[in-house]
A protein has these predicted regions:
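Terminal amphipathic helices with adjacent charged low-complexity linkers/tails
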Residues: 64, 77-90, 125-149, 208-212, ...
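Extended, well-ordered alpha-helical scaffold/bundle regions in very large, multi-domain proteins
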Residues: 197, 204-252
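Acidic, glycine-rich active-site loops and adjacent beta-strand->loop/helix elements
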Residues: 6-11, 55-59, 124-125, 238-242
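Function-dense linear segments that define catalytic or interfacial modules
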Residues: 1-16, 24-27, 37-41, 110-202, ...
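Glycine-rich and small/hydrophobic secondary-structure elements
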Residues: 18-36, 230-247
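Short active-site loop/helix that positions an aromatic residue
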Residues: 59-68
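A short alpha->loop->secondary-structure connector
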Residues: 67-75
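Gly/Pro-rich turn-and-neighbor structural signature
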Residues: 60, 91-109, 113-118, 238-252
Length: 252
């Protein structure tokens, strides 16, 4: 992920040249065009997250930059909002502040094509005040990351953890969660990082993501209707279980 918050607003004067700055969105487009020429393993196109703070001068253009289908195709985009901004929106703001207008644009864009997303930066940094602040996330937004930090992700196939009687095999699920955690931690040691800074930060914080897949198939095997109360309760119980097992294993 990239935070474009330090890029000066479009049209502001660059002191060293006397020329107007291109702005955050033009730099975002430049990055997207460059990444379009790079693939992962020769097949998968590059993916990134572009983040801009809610108070940046280019925020309106940023919110609208993907409304045209096919533009900036190699980035998801998210607006970094603060607790103060949300407080003002929830509790009413001055009509002339412009905040409600910006908020309405975010909501409209999310309704039209799912972008921009929202990152609650104060919440993200609430437990990380002793180290450098987090400004961005990985491409899908599930893992907030510091500069040069990386996170290894893996998923447990839930459908493979339903026994022949149509019940969750909790013991087998626990074993898989423990194995997944160890596996991902070993990947940090064994994988090759593109630059030394990434390797150093990854081994410093050792972030991993133990996720799941196959939830819908699990429901089919268990005879649960998707979206039912039973299905929602199952999802909550499974994730609490995987989380608890993973946390306990990480302390050993």
């Amino acid at each position: 992920g990239f935070s474009f918050g330090r890029i000066r607003g479009k049209g502001s004067t660059v002191a060293s040249t006397g020329r107007p700055a291109p702005g955050a969105v033009n730099v975002l487009q430049l990055y997207s065009d460059a990444i379009a020429r790079v693939t992962q393993a020769g097949m998968r196109p590059g993916a990134n997250m572009g983040v801009l703070p809610i108070d940046h001068p280019d925020i309106e253009q940023f919110i609208d930059c993907k409304q045209t289908e096919g533009s900036i195709t190699n980035f998801n985009i998210s607006v970094a909002v603060t607790d103060q901004f949300m407080h003002n929106i929830i509790h009413g703001d001055r009509p002339d502040s412009g905040r409600q207008f910006i908020w309405d644009k975010i909501i409209d864009g999310a309704w039209r094509n799912g972008e921009p997303g929202i990152l609650f930066m104060d919440t993200i940094n609430n437990g990380a005040l002793h180290v450098e602040p987090i400004e961005a996330t990985n491409p899908c937004g599930e893992v907030p990351l510091r500069p040069y930090e990386a996170c290894v992700l893996g998923s447990i196939n839930l459908a493979a953890h339903v026994n022949g009687d149509g019940f969750v095999d909790w013991a087998e699920l626990a074993a898989s969660a423990r194995t997944m955690l160890r596996l991902l931690d070993h990947v940090i040691e064994k994988q090759a990082s593109p630059i030394p800074e990434i390797e150093a930060e990854q081994k410093r914080y050792r972030k991993i993501g133990v996720g799941v897949m196959g939830y819908a198939d699990m429901l089919i095997k268990m005879g649960y209707e998707y979206g039912s109360e039973a299905a929602l309760d199952l999802a909550e119980n499974v994730m609490h279980y995987v989380q608890d097992i993973s946390y306990n294993e990480s302390m050993h």
